[in-house]
């Protein structure tokens, strides 16, 4: 413990394990209870039995009536109450000092760094970390136990005080116990002063009980806050990524949008027909006719037209525009479809429609097409 001696370390340890409410309670108990009982209660109750007068000459009647009126001396009862209530705090303080001295004998200890807390080491309480990172032992559980005992003792002595003495000292006390004959009236000395002292000590006891409850609640909340949470692995934090973005997708730094992969090129379709359609749109007339013998010629002319197309045109635009306004885009889509599917090179001639022309007209059209 560099720069801190044994006494200073013990004081720091005790100070860190006692809350502000506990310190206020200690001051209240020592000043307002013990000093008032010793300095003010003793003169008031010193001659209590001598001044207790009964209106009878029967021997022993006054002593019996005084025993009924005050089975226990008020002064002794309050002294026992104060000592018993202070006893749990004294035991806790001795325990803390003993453990602190044991820790000091082991040598200087430091609080672990924040990066070491994930490995399971106990973190020092934030309110107990002094300059230099001095580690102070935590006795929160023992402090809560001592508070429970102290509060129970306070409540028990309060109930017993009410059963024995009540709240006020009476002016006279009727007594019917033998050897008294009939009802005997006994008179108490200084009843007003005793009543004021009793009310003051009742208020001190109530305040002590409320401070004990408040200290207990604060200590429980502090213990819950000090409880360490589950450690978070660095790999889990890296995999979680930025909030609002799904895992595995990179984020564009400039626009903040997700980068989408290039879409798969769509399959070119001729005139909206399927992959197995044997129809190809004509360049001149739009009639669908492909004879068996001219399949190779159509394929060669389509490859020439594909070679003439400008290379700067995007593939997506050429593939997604099957209804082009010119007559050059329609024949180009069909040969590309035929080239992509080799099984379509052997196309069966479709059944001639009812409005089809004759064989001579077909030959003339074929010669013009070539």
From Swiss-Prot:
Membrane disposition: Multi-pass membrane protein
SMART domains in the cross-refs: CNX, Connexin_CCC
GO biological process: cell-cell signaling
Subcellular location: Cell membrane; Cell junction, Gap junction
PROSITE patterns: CONNEXINS_1, CONNEXINS_2
Signal peptide segment: none
Residue ranges that the UniProt entry lists as topological domain Cytoplasmic: 1-19, 98-146, 218-370
Residue ranges, annotated region (Disordered): 227-370
Keyword set includes tRNA processing: no
A Pfam family it matches: Connexin
Compositional bias segments (type: Basic and acidic residues): 246-260
PANTHER family named in the record: CONNEXIN (PTHR11984), GAP JUNCTION DELTA-4 PROTEIN (PTHR11984:SF3)
General function of this protein: One gap junction consists of a cluster of closely packed pairs of transmembrane channels, the connexons, through which materials of low MW diffuse from one cell to a neighboring cell.
Subunit and partners: A connexon is composed of a hexamer of connexins.
Similarity remark: Belongs to the connexin family. Delta-type subfamily.
Name of the featured protein: Gap junction delta-4 protein
Gene from which the chain derives: GJD4
């Amino acid at each position: 413990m560099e720069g801190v001696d044994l006494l200073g370390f013990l004081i720091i340890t005790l100070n860190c394990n006692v809350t502000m409410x506990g310190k206020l309670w200690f001051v209240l108990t020592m000043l307002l209870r013990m000093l008032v009982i010793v300095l003010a209660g003793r003169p008031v109750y010193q001659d209590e039995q001598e001044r207790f007068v009964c209106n009878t000459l029967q021997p022993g009647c006054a002593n019996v009536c005084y025993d009924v009126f005050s089975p226990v001396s008020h002064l002794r009862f309050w002294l026992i109450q104060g000592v018993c209530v202070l006893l749990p705090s004294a035991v806790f303080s001795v325990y803390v000092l003993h453990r602190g001295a044991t820790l000091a004998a082991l040598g200087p200890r430091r609080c672990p760094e924040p990066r070491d807390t994930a490995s399971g080491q106990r973190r020092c309480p934030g309110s107990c970390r002094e300059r230099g990172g001095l580690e102070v032992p935590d006795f929160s559980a023992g402090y809560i136990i001592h508070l429970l005992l102290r509060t129970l003792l306070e409540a028990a002595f309060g109930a017993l005080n009410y059963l024995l003495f009540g709240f006020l000292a009476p002016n006279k006390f009727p007594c019917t116990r033998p050897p008294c004959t009939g009802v005997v009236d006994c008179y108490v000395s200084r009843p007003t002063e005793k009543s004021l002292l009793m009310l003051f000590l009742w208020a001190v006891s109530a305040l002590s009980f409320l401070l004990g409850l408040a200290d207990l609640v604060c200590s429980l909340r502090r213990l819950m806050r000090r409880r360490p949470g589950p450690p978070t692995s660095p790999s889990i934090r890296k995999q979680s990524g930025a909030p609002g973005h799904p895992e595995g997708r990179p984020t564009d730094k400039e626009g903040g949008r997700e980068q989408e992969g290039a879409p798969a090129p769509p399959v070119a379709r001729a005139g909206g027909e399927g992959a197995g359609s044997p129809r190809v749109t004509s360049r001149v007339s739009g009639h669908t006719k492909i004879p068996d013998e001219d399949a190779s010629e159509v394929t060669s002319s389509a490859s020439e037209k594909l070679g003439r197309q400008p290379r700067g045109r995007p593939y997506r635009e050429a593939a997604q525009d099957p209804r082009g306004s010119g007559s050059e885009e329609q024949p180009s889509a069909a040969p590309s479809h035929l080239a992509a599917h080799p099984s379509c090179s052997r196309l069966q001639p479709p059944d001639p429609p009812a409005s089809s022309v004759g064989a001579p007209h077909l030959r003339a059209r074929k010669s013009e097409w070539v």
